[in-house]
Amino acid sequence: GELGEVSATIPLIESLREDRNVDVRVRAARALGRLGGREVVEPLVEALNDENPQVCITATDALIEIGDVATDSLIESLDSEKVNVRCDATRALGEIGNPKAVDYIIKMLKDEWVNVRIYAVTSLGKLNDTKAVPSLIEVMQNEKENDLVRAGAAAALGVLRDQRALLPLRELIMEAEELGELEDTALKSFKKIMAANWQAIPGAQ
């Protein structure tokens, strides 16, 4: 896979799809990621359904390495019935960073599986689009939501550094009976946003 020759992709795709040996499939996925190109995207996306988690993880990393070309296929994978495929696609889209993915990842905040929602809040921070701010605030404020998801949303708001998050973050910290991981994350994000926006905040100078 080091040479980057297109002719090398065909046997590698066959190995990824058909070889019964897990190590062979893992190596094929890794090599296809290095080779890149549009023609390797579909077989790698298919490999997100592999029965072996290591193959799925390697295929995800390969798609991240390929980058933008994989965006549309990964967006389609967000509709998969398999939880791990939705997780892997959500993670990969955050790492690739194409702004086209933002609206689709916002929808994943409503996924029934907590792991998908954790990847979604993290990816929205990485995608760095302030369009996600209202949805992230809503998740953070939702007391019925899992604390890891809420903390992830608070952390993402700190990355986005949007002033709209200041009041909700402050309320979360002030209303807490005790400072746990969620409140600690909210406090860190509050400080980050204040530091980034202090000149624009009335009375902060």
What are these regions (language model features)?
Residues N49, I137, R170:
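Residue-level detector of conserved, well-ordered beta-strand and adjacent loop positions
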Residues G1-E5, I10, E14, V22-R38, ...:
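Structural detector for internal amphipathic alpha-helices that build alpha-solenoid repeat scaffolds
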Residues L167-E178:
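TPR/TPR-like (Sel1-like) alpha-helical repeat modules
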Residues P202-Q205:
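Alpha-helical repeat scaffolds
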Residues P11, S135, P168:
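Phosphate- and divalent-cation-binding pockets in alpha/beta enzyme and binding domains
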